[in-house]
């Protein structure tokens, strides 16, 4: 006879896919002058946070990176966080 385990059967856990914060009707525009918005996408070490963590779409991630680099060049954001 086959043994039946007494452990409950678990359903697989599916994490809900995050949506891009820059896509949609009321989404903020990516602008190099908006330092507060850009700082949310920079790590404590001063690196640009990858899109797999922030759930930003590929197109908007490129725009975001370009805006951060432009703000750094103009002196609005630091290159190195001290």
UniProtKB/Swiss-Prot annotation:
- What Pfam family is a match for this entry? Ribosomal_S18
Gene Ontology terms: cellular component: cytosolic small ribosomal subunit
- The highest taxon in the source lineage is Bacteria
Q: Name one GO biological process term.
A: translation
List the keywords (alphabetical).
Ribonucleoprotein, Ribosomal protein, RNA-binding, rRNA-binding
- InterPro entries, per this entry? Ribosomal_bS18 (IPR001648), Ribosomal_bS18_CS (IPR018275), Ribosomal_bS18_sf (IPR036870)
Which GO molecular-function terms appear in the entry?
A: small ribosomal subunit rRNA binding; structural constituent of ribosome
Subunit organization: Part of the 30S ribosomal subunit. Forms a tight heterodimer with protein bS6.
Family according to the record: Belongs to the bacterial ribosomal protein bS18 family.
Q: What does this protein do?
A: Binds as a heterodimer with protein bS6 to the central domain of the 16S rRNA, where it helps stabilize the platform of the 30S subunit.
Tell me what this protein is called: Small ribosomal subunit protein bS18
Give the source lineage, highest ranks first: Bacteria, Pseudomonadati, Pseudomonadota, Alphaproteobacteria, Hyphomicrobiales
């Amino acid at each position: 006879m086959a043994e039946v385990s007494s452990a409950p059967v678990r359903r697989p856990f599916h994490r809900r896919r995050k949506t891009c914060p820059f896509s949609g009707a009321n989404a903020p525009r990516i602008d190099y002058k908006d330092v507060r918005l850009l700082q949310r996408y920079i790590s404590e070490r001063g690196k640009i946070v990858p899109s797999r963590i922030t759930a930003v779409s590929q197109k908007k991630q490129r725009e975001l990176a370009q805006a951060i680099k432009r703000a750094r060049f103009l002196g609005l954001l630091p290159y190195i966080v001290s």
